[in-house]
Amino acid sequence: MDLVSRIENLPIGKFHYTLLWVVGLGWMFDALDTGIIAFIMTTLVKDWALTPAESGWIVSIGFIGMALGAVFSGGLADRFGRKTVFATTLLIYSLATAACAFAPNLTWLLAFRFIVGLGLGGQLPVAVTLVSEYIPAHVRGRFIVLLESFWGLGWLVAALVSYFVIPHFGWHIAFLIGGLPAIYVYVIIKKVPESIPYLINRGRIDEAHELVQQIERHAGVPVIDTIVVKPVAQKQQVSFRQLWSGRFARRSLMLWLVWFGIVFSYYGIFTWLPSLLVKQGYSVVQSFEYVLIMILAQLPGYISAAWLVERLGRKATLAGFIGACAISAYFFGQADTVFNIMVWGCLLSFFNLGAWGVLYTYTPEQYPANIRAFGAGWASAVGRMGGIAAPIVVTHMMVAHDGFHQVFMMFTLVLLAVAAVIVILGEETQGKTLESIGL
C-alpha cells in the first residue's frame, strides 16, 4: 500500500480531530482579523471623517492583498510546504493587524491593511489543502465544513470584542487584540504535520514514510515498514497552463466564477452590514447587537452543511445553500422592521456561511496533489477580486436613494447566477479520493 493510501485508510481518531482543532483555530484567528474591520469602520468613519470612497478603499485594499496572497501562497505551499506557509501567513496578518492600531493617518492604515490582506489571503487555501490531504474521502467533506465553521467562531469573537471594547476603549485596542494570534504560531510549529503528498512531490520520501509510521503508531494500527510511492504522486512541474488544460479547464472556469460571486456577495454584505444598519437609523451599539445575533446563525449553518455534504453531495448542497441565500438576501433588503431584519438576516447568515463550508470542501477536490494548492490559491485569488469590487460598489450604492434595497437586490441576482454556474458546470466529487479525482 502506498503512503497516501495508508493515510487515506487510517481510522478517524485523535490525530484527525487534533489537526482539525489546531488548523481550525488558525482559521478562527483569520476570521477575527477579517471581521473586526467591519465593526471598526462604524466608528473610524466618524473619527477620521472619511468619505465613502476612502472607507471603501480601507476594505478593498485588504482584498487586493488577499488576492496576491492567495496567488503566491499556493505556489509557495507547493514549493516550501503547507505547514511553513500556514504559520508564516498567520504571523504576517497578526502583526500587521496590531500595527493598524498605531496608524497615524489613512495612508499608513491602507499600507498595513494591504499587508494584513497578504497574510489572510495566503492562509485560507493552504489550510484547507493541508487538512484535505490528511482526511479520508468518506468524511473529508464533513471535516472541511467543520474547519470552515471556525470562521463563524472568528466572526463571533470579532463581534464580541467590538461590542465590549470599541464603545468603551476605542478601535485602537480592538486592532491590538487582533494582533494577539501571532503567539499561536508556536502551537502550529509544534502540532501541525507537513503534508504527505507535498513531501513525496519534493522527493522527501523517507521523511514522509517516517511521518506516516508515526501517525500509524499513534492511531494504534499496524506500522508498515515497506515504502511504496505511486508514480502519479512523484514531483511534477507546476504551471498556470495546467489549470486550463484538458479536464481542468471546465473545473477552473466553474471555480473562478463561483469564487468571484460568493466572495463579492459575502464581503459586500457582511463587511458593511453594521454600517448599512447604522445608515438605516439604528445606533452603533444596536447594529453590533443585531449583527452578533446574525453571526450566531452561522454555526448551525455549518453543522447542517457538514451533515448534508456527505448525503446530498457537494454540488447539490452548494447550489441549494447559495440559492436559499439569494432568497434570504432579497427579503432582507425588503425588511422594514427589526423582526424581519433579524429573521432574514439570520437566514442569510445561515445559508451563506454553510455554502462557504461546502466550497472549501469542493475546491481542492478539483485538482491533483502537485497543483492542488496552486489551483486552490488561484480560485481564492479570483474570488478576492470580487472582494475588492464589492466594498467600492456598495459604498457608492449606499449613498443613492433607496440604496439599502438596491444593494440587496444586486446581491440576490449575483447569488442566483452563482447557483446556476454550479448546476451547469459543477462535477460531483462526493466519496472519491483526492488522487482519483485528479486523474
UniProtKB/Swiss-Prot annotation:
Residues spanning the membrane: 20-40, 57-77, 84-104, 108-128, 143-163, 169-189, 253-273, 288-308, 316-336, 338-358, 374-394, 407-427
Pfam families in alphabetical order: Sugar_tr
InterPro entries: MFS_dom (IPR020846), MFS_sugar_transport-like (IPR005828), MFS_trans_sf (IPR036259), Sugar_transporter_CS (IPR005829)
Source organism of this protein record: Acinetobacter baylyi (strain ATCC 33305 / BD413 / ADP1)
PROSITE patterns linked: MFS, SUGAR_TRANSPORT_1, SUGAR_TRANSPORT_2
Cystine crosslinks: none
Function, as annotated: Functions as a high-affinity transporter of niacin (nicotinamide or nicotinate). Probably substantially contributes to niacin transport when its concentration in the medium is very low.
Protein name as it appears in the record: Niacin transporter NiaP
This protein's encoding gene: niaP
Mode of membrane association: Multi-pass membrane protein
GO MF term (any one): transmembrane transporter activity
GO CC annotations on file: plasma membrane
Keywords: Cell inner membrane, Cell membrane, Membrane, Transmembrane, Transmembrane helix, Transport
Annotated family: Belongs to the major facilitator superfamily. Sugar transporter (TC 2.A.1.1) family.
Gene deletion effect: When compared with a nadB mutant (with blocked de novo NAD biosynthesis route), the nadB-niaP double mutant requires at least a 200-fold higher niacin concentration for normal growth.
Origin superkingdom: Bacteria
Keyword Mitochondrion: no
Subcellular location: Cell inner membrane
